[in-house]
């Protein structure tokens, strides 16, 4: 079935989260896995300090290199971003990111849901955060040894608290005793995004995530795309109405905000929307106008 990925998305997200955090026993031991695999980056936003983490967070790894006193252009991590971006684009956000799945689960909690359609300008904030907190501040705000802090991880990222600080503190009395104002500040950010995720769909992905900002740059050229068959399309706009990322699916199926979740495919009454594999866009006709 052409919509196989969309139909089994929840299971794929669960499997991806498990593979990204395969060392489950470490959660109870309060120890961080530091084996050879930890030098490799995982696709989604997943804290290095999570005791169960299989690999490194690409954003954290990038900041570590940028903030190093012996800074060199990080060919490995930059190449990692480009490779995954060119192959999948923001499919990673929709299917492979643990924090994205966490927000999806929160949004399933029954209650009033709010639209982000009128908040579209906030989507550009994640690009500002990418440039300022992931690149510029770690590179140029340094200590006496010439080393910069991982500003995004340290001061913004809620995933670090959820996966790293909280499990480690629960398992280690020494860490609990050392928690201070920074933890309180970060925990407040996490709590805020938990509340926002119940009300809005994926607020962190839309407005804050620098990893999503990077992958979004490749959405229009990636190997995996969304394809609209305009000969089948009847212009009902059901696809755009169900899109929780506020994308006009018919006009811009591969918009930078599209996370390839497939909800538009399930809503289409004529099966005019499907995944398209390949770099060629010949089959992906533009709209009739």
Language-model features, listed with the residues they occupy:
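Non-ligating segments of multi-cofactor redox enzymes
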Residues: 1-250, 256-289
